[in-house]
């Protein structure tokens, strides 16, 4: 007879495998929610500063800083840092020990430990000569799509005073992160708590972040126009101080000239800018900054040299 078509039974037809969704990313730390926007703004500069960095080994480095200013006496700082062998990312190495001591004997120290694959611990100490000012202990757990942190600040069992801070962040989508912060403080005759809600939305070229609570609000917007230009906008309102500030920051990178420019304008009539210039092949970076507050009629400028 004629040709016949061999048809496969319905059950034998190939099926499309279900599309696997990518797992949600970890939202990171609560303290880093506004980091991208803050990195756009220039740091305050005043006086003359010389910084000499020296790498002693793959694990240990030191830095010497001399600062001279018209607002105070000259100062010297010795900075030392130790980094271990366990590197989780280009910016995360465990254990890490960092210390900074000035000419008056005051010390700022920080210790970072990786207790388990997802559990991290941090201890911070600050002294003024022979007196302890601050001691703080942090524990952070990073899940697949969430981060939980608990902080104890200045715990004093005898004086019955303590500051407890709890953070939680959850990735709802690849772009949206929601969470909150609870700050509890207690000392003799006083006790209170402040709750703050937080949200962050990340697009391809911009990031918007908002913190709202009984203590005030903090909103930031970061936009990367291209490889050279970044801008940031910040809004901060403090209900206790009855103060509101609006700031605009500008970041310009000129790779061919080895220069970086940062500028700011805020609602307090303050204008400032910092220009950094690298001097290859020498390991030297020059920085020049100036800030003017029109409302208070204050002007200060600074110059720094970083070697290494």
From Swiss-Prot:
The gene for this chain is TOMM40L
Q: Does the keyword Acetylation apply?
A: no
Q: What is the lineage of its organism?
A: Eukaryota, Metazoa, Chordata, Craniata, Vertebrata
Q: What does this protein do?
A: Potential channel-forming protein implicated in import of protein precursors into mitochondria.
Query: Region labeled Required for mitochondrial targeting — which residues?
Result: 281-308
Q: Which InterPro entries match?
A: Porin_dom_sf, Porin_Euk/Tom40, Tom40
Q: What is its main location?
A: mitochondrion
Annotated membrane topology is: Multi-pass membrane protein
- The name on file for this protein is Mitochondrial import receptor subunit TOM40B
Database matches in CDD domains: Porin3_Tom40
What keywords tag this UniProt record? Membrane, Mitochondrion, Mitochondrion outer membrane, Protein transport, Transmembrane, Transmembrane beta strand, Transport
